[in-house]
A protein has these predicted regions:
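A structural motif corresponding to the C-terminal lobe/cap of the Radical SAM core domain
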Residues: 1-129
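Membrane-proximal basic amphipathic "stem/tether" segments
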Residues: 105-184
Length: 184
């Protein structure tokens, strides 16, 4: 219920607490206008970090069963080759490749846009481009930096190096792929 969430965020902000939301876009049948409602909700409430994910219906979940039952998955996608990352692309069918690319790119700039809504016109231009690895790199670095501003966690050097290693491996592993529409 949006009113309950709205009231909760307002109460948290009024009491000086940071608000971190996790948003999922690219749901079956979702329009870009619906994704913008999610974006605008975050902007309106001044959330401190609006993390965003592309829907990945993992095997064994109700959403996976719903996607299989209603033919919402792209051709050839099944439990054996489901993308393991909700940061790169989507295995959900969209009305067109252009619409899918728009969602994929919007995802990459969602959290940045919530913090800088005055740049939405520029983000909308960027969304018209083909998804690319530079956008992935921007998203991972911006979100990684932004979350450290919201969730203040003290880490020992071993933990910090482990987190850095994981992100570097993830980012450069993706960069070795040649297909800009890669789902994996």
């Amino acid at each position: 219920d949006l009113k309950v969430m709205s009231d909760a965020i307002t109460a948290l902000k009024e009491n000086g607490l940071r608000v971190y939301t996790q948003n999922i876009i690219g749901n079956p049948g979702e329009t870009f206008a619906m994704a913008m409602e999610t974006f605008n909700f975050n902007v309106k409430h001044g959330v401190d970090f609006a993390e965003c994910f592309l829907l990945t219906p993992f095997y064994g979940t109700e959403i996976y069963e719903n996607c299989v039952k209603n033919d919402f998955l792209e051709k050839g996608i099944n439990m054996d080759n489901m993308p393991q990352s909700y940061w790169l692309g989507s295995c959900i069918k969209f009305s067109s490749l252009k619409e899918k690319d728009k969602f994929i790119n919007f995802h990459k700039f969602f959290s940045f846009g919530v913090q800088h809504p005055y740049l939405l016109p520029l983000i909308k231009i960027i969304m018209k481009l083909s998804p690319n690895k530079l956008f992935v790199l921007f998203n991972r670095f911006y979100d990684s930096w932004r979350i450290t501003r919201v969730i203040r966690v003290k880490m020992d050097i071993v933990t910090l190096l482990g987190v850095v290693k994981m992100n570097v491996k993830y980012i450069f592993g993706f960069f070795l792929k040649t297909d800009s529409h890669s789902k994996f």
